[in-house]
């Protein structure tokens, strides 16, 4: 598995991030787009390792993720592009690999100095920015360019952000969607 070099800054203002990136001569490479994903448990069950099938409507990927810690390089991933979201989901089902959850979020993507800057909006929690790059040094430098201190960053994965920061257990939710959350809040 390859190491990802990524950190998140929680509870951000998406407009401020966009203005800052563009002022630094970065570029927007993806408008705010709905991402849909199915997550699957691995066998044997390991809370820190899972399979993710994700699409943004244009590109669909299948990945296995393994979080080994909370540092900038502690997420391992193997990912490949697949042809179609629903067909890949049906294939997983036919292999006996059952969906753990269905999740949605919105993502806007920017590039700046070799880093990918992703503004993520998820149900029930404030937006956050994820910075991913080829090296931990580029990740930390980008955090500083955006006006943050690296000590403000976390290496927590999404599920851990929900659980440890916001006290919401999404690991046992069959779906995490904006419209279903809105219905529950009414």
Summary of predicted features, one role per range:
Residues 118-126:
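A contiguous pocket-lining binding segment that forms or flanks enzyme active sites
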Residues 1-116, 149, 153-186:
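N-terminal strand-loop-strand beta-hairpin
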Residues 136, 142-149:
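A hydrophobic, small-residue-rich beta->alpha segment in the mid-to-C-terminal subdomain
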Residues 14, 139-140:
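Short, well-ordered alpha-helical microsegments
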Residues 65-67, 122, 134:
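Surface loops and adjacent helix of pleckstrin homology
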Residues 68-71, 125, 137:
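Short, surface-exposed beta-strand-loop junctions and turns on beta-sheet-rich folds
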């Amino acid at each position: 598995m390859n190491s990802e070099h990524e950190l998140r800054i929680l509870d951000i203002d998406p407009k401020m991030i966009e203005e800052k990136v563009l002022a630094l001569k970065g570029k927007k490479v993806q408008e705010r787009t709905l991402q849909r994903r199915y997550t699957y448990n691995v066998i044997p069950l390991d809370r820190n390792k899972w399979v993710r099938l994700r699409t943004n409507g244009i590109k669909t990927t299948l990945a296995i993720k393994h979080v080994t810690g909370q540092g900038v390089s502690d997420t391992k991933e193997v990912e490949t592009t697949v042809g179609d979201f629903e067909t890949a989901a049906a294939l997983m089902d036919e292999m006996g690999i059952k969906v753990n959850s269905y999740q949605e979020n919105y993502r806007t993507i920017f590039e700046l100095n070799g880093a990918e800057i992703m503004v993520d909006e998820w149900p029930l929690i404030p937006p956050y920015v994820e910075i991913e790059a080829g090296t931990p040094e580029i990740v930390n430098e980008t955090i500083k360019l955006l006006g943050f201190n690296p000590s403000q960053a976390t290496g927590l994965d999404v599920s851990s952000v929900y659980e440890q920061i916001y006290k919401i257990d999404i690991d046992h939710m069959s779906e995490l969607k904006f419209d279903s959350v809105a219905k529950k809040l009414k």
